[in-house]
Amino acid sequence: MLIFPINTFCQNINSYNINAILNSEDKTLTVSQIMKFKNTSNISLNKIVLEDWANSYVDNRTSLAKRISDEYSRSFTFATKKQRGSTQIKSITSNNIESWNKSEKTSDIINIYLKKELKIGESIEIEINYQVKLPDSKFTGYGFDNNNYYLKNWIIVFSNISGSDWYSQSNLNLNDQSLKKSIYKMKISFDKEYYLFSNLTINKTELLTNTKSVYLSGSDINDVKIDLLIDQNYRKFKNINNEIETDIFKTSSVKEAAKKVKRVNDFVKDYFNDNSDLKLLVAKSDYELNPFYGLNQLPSFISPFSDKFLEEIVFLKSFMINYLHQKLNLNRRESHWVYKGLEIFIIDKYINDFYPKVRFIGQLAGINILKNYEISKMNFNDLFLNYSEYVQRLNLHQADDQSSEYLTRINHDIASPYHSGVGLKYLENLIGENNLKDLILKISSIDSREDLNNLFLNYQKSDLNWFIEDYIGNRQSIDLKLKRINKNEILIEEKNNISIPYSIGYLKNDSIIQTIDFEEYKKIKIPNIDFDYIVINPKISLPELNKSNNWIYNNSNLKPLKIKFI
């Protein structure tokens, strides 16, 4: 029995009315659901596509199972039936359904065939009853873990549609389900000893003898996150129109944590000029699925950063993951570089503003044996550029605009996010902060890869073709080269025929005395000024395969010696 009248739903977007009951004995959710879909595509539809990601755990033949196996993990291959998840559909009904079936190619896509076409602007209401067997959370981070439940991607939902194409995306353990923003109204019942935390708003709680029922709702929601925990691990922080629940701050006092949450929230929302209401569940597990590379490789007894600093940047990264997923409407699989690049770009800006003196190796930079090495002078944010270049030198990198299902794990988690983030920083330096903000604001209002590319390719204030075609869309590494022709001229080349705007700087006593911007490779006349050496891109650097040819000393063929190691 459903708990909200369906006619209270908004008429312009998809909506879900859900009644779910958790059985903690057999780790199942029994679900009754009414879902309403509006045809916002550009064609009449003869079928509706649903995504049933809970069923991606059913056996070793699913796309998820193959993905986990391809990443050299045998945990799923040898999992017991009790550890795996599945969906048992009991009924799918509507006055306009001819038939339905599971996709032949994958077990987590459902095709519903209609009796008559659903015209543009028309809606269909579907009632579905099913039971979800929750998986062990060790596979993807979602499901059951001892006595706790981490619920995400368990609801059968409408696949997104852009133009005339259904996404029809299977679960590949990429945390990238891309759904249309929808209205959710839910009643979920469970054993009374559990605490519930969610990105939905809790409207009411009913206590019975042995169970608890919680009524939740939310508008403009991309996906639903619910944690059911034995312990009250989350802290709640409220501002004027924001509510954030997080389990990250364990060392910081409540007052310190509230200050940091407000600072991160205000910084991000100010940058995006966002005054909307916000309800986020910012979990440490979101960070652990994609941590800062390098920090997670350190053994627990080595801690170059204070616990309070680590808590703040872990919260910042997890906040950005959840915030961008909620605010952007692009296909997260096709356009992953936008989500991951913006995440790294904002983190870089935040650390530059509030922690500009924090070093790449933290407190280890003060150890005498390391003081004379370049690594001790590198800032924390330098890790994004350095790890991006590191993967390029290993020749393991892939193009950023390649759909994430084809990226290797090192590219998905490290190289592509860092490369994209550094690229946005470089772009901001070229076109200015306000122009980049305006560009990002426009990105938040589009939902297709074609529109995204056109936004850059048709940009009026500057030629940004290079960014999409040569930087994001090209696997070939950049290699700018500075060559002295004679006493008065230099030549700038790009050895791999990649078109990238650049600047030339003249330095004296390690200070920049003049920079000139260029958009083409050519001979350049050296100005009549007193300088020590010439350098390509002295302010903001791009990932390059070889930077040893980016310098020329004025009075010597020697170049500044840099010793770097990862």
Language model regions located:
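Extended, low-hydrophobicity, Ser/Thr/Pro/Gly-biased non-transmembrane segments
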Residues: 72-91, 104, 108, 127-227, ...
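N-terminal, polar/Ser/Thr-rich
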Residues: 9-30, 42, 155, 465-466
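Amphipathic alpha-helical substructures
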Residues: 404-485
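Juxtacatalytic substrate-recognition/specificity segment
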Residues: 186, 235-338, 342-350, 544
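Ligand-binding face of N-terminal immunoglobulin V-set domains in extracellular IgSF glycoproteins
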Residues: 28-62, 67-75
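Solvent-exposed beta-strand/loop surfaces of large extracellular or lumenal domains
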Residues: 58-114, 137-142, 201-209, 281, ...
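Beta-strand-rich binding/interaction modules
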Residues: 197, 280, 435, 464-467, ...
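Acidic/His/Gly-enriched intrinsically disordered linker/tail segments
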Residues: 334, 340-422
